[in-house]
Structures are given as structure tokens and as C-alpha cells.
Amino acid sequence: MEGLLIALIPMFAWGSIGFVSNKIGGRPNQQTFGMTLGALLFAIIVWLFKQPEMTASLWIFGILGGILWSVGQNGQFQAMKYMGVSVANPLSSGAQLVGGSLVGALVFHEWTKPIQFILGLTALTLLVIGFYFSSKRDVSEQALATHQEFSKGFATIAYSTVGYISYAVLFNNIMKFDAMAVILPMAVGMCLGAICFMKFRVNFEAVVVKNMITGLMWGVGNVFMLLAAAKAGLAIAFSFSQLGVIISIIGGILFLGETKTKKEQKWVVMGILCFVMGAILLGIVKSY
């Protein structure tokens, strides 16, 4: 029971980042920079308490991973501007799950048993269906939704997904570091990536400083993800962490005023259910 409660914390922490950042405001580049500053602050605090051994390879690959992460996060913030948080977040999370699972299964042979392929392919099918319903719009309302530039949103989700999957593959399949040790080099890389997106014009504006809270939320989610994996197992921790899309959808509608027609509300619920079932199945696949 304790493990399940701990697993809820990453779900809420990561799932809230999108609507909290958009409630604070700022351009995507400012949101990314503010978030990475918060992550760097969190990483420094962790390092002061843990003081792990820091090797050259840890710094090099940690910084590289952080830069890749910043590409993913910046693209996600861009997509939120085009599509809204309640649409962009589930699409981004689903794309990462599908892409990451396929890379893991086909390139790194993470699926070796028949049951893994059966459950894994079923999960991916559910996630794709979830994609469809989460982004489906009421045709009668499309003329009123000119501010939601979905084509640009899908393009930004595409490069965001490449960034996130590359970062995940680097840390999970190529270089395996202690999470508490690599968090500082990674946070440095995240900041460097964010500064590149700002074209090296660094301004510590109020909106940037306020967005640091999302970086702290990211850090808290990471720590409790590790604790949940230790207490309840990786399958539970992974599945629960992916359910943050529910929080982002609800948060976008309640706190950002993103409107949905009755048809779209039904489609969103169907999409959420598919995401939940798909994420749980992928968690089960990881347990084999």
C-alpha cells in the first residue's frame, strides 16, 4: 500500500507540469529555461546530500542526455501552445510510450518471451487508439478552433518524441548510471539545451523564475519514482507515472479553460481509458 501511495506522487508531479507552467505563462523557450533552472537547483541540493562519485563519462553522457531531454521538453511546450495542454500532453506521452517500446523491443530486444509480444502489441494498439480519440475534434467546432494549429502541434510533438526517446535510450539502454549521481550533469545539460533554444540570450525574467517550480516538480517526481520502484516494483512505478496524462487533461480543462464539446468530452474519456490500459499492460511487460 505504501508503494502505491508513493507511486501516485510522480503521477501528480509530472502530470501537473504542463498546466502549471502554462498557468504561470511565458513563451515555450522561457518555460523550458525556467524549468531547467529549477531542475538544476534540485540537482544541486541532491548532490549536496548524496555527494556521489562523479566520473568523466558520467558528466559527458549526463550533459548529452540533458540536452536531448531539453529538445523533448521544449517541443512539448511548443505543442501545448498549438494544441492545448489537454491534447498535447497525452499525445506526447503516448508517442513516447509507443516509440520507446518499439525501439526497446526491436533494437535492444527487451521483449524476448511470446507473452511480452502479445501484451506489448496489445498495449501499443490501445495507445494508438488513445492517440486517435485524444486528438479527435468535433468537425462542427473546427471553424471555431482556428487558434489550435494542430498541424504545427503534431510537428513539434514529432521532434519532441525523438528528443525524449533518444534521452531514454541513452540512459536506459546504452549507459546505465545511478539516477542520483547523473541528475546533476543531466540538469547542466538541460540548462545548456534551454539556453541554445533562447539563442544564448539569457534573461532571468519574472516568468522564467516562476517556471522554476516546474523543475522542482520534475525533480520530486524523479526521486519518488525511484522510491516507488523500490517499494512496489518497476511495473507499478512505471504504470502509475505514465498516468499523469489524466492529471494534465483534467488540469488543462479545469485550470486553463480549455473547452471541449460533449462529443469531444466522450472521446477524451475513451482516449484516457485506452492510455490507462495501455500503460498498465506495458508495466506488466516490464515485469517479465
Swiss-Prot record:
| UniProt xrefs under Pfam families | Sugar_transport
Q: Which ranges does the record mark as transmembrane? A: 4-26, 33-50, 55-72, 85-107, 117-134, 154-171, 181-200, 207-229, 234-256, 268-285
The protein here is known as Putative sugar uptake protein SAG2157
One GO molecular-function annotation for this sequence? carbohydrate transmembrane transporter activity
Its cellular-component GO annotations read: plasma membrane
Q: Does the keyword Transport apply?
A: yes
Task: Please report which protein family the annotation says this sequence is part of.
Answer: Belongs to the GRP transporter (TC 2.A.7.5) family.
Q: Which UniProt keywords apply?
A: Cell membrane, Membrane, Sugar transport, Transmembrane, Transmembrane helix, Transport
Q: Does the keyword Secreted apply?
A: no
Q: Where is the protein found, in the record's own terms?
A: Cell membrane
Domain of life according to the entry: Bacteria
Task: Provide the topology term for how it sits in the membrane.
Answer: Multi-pass membrane protein
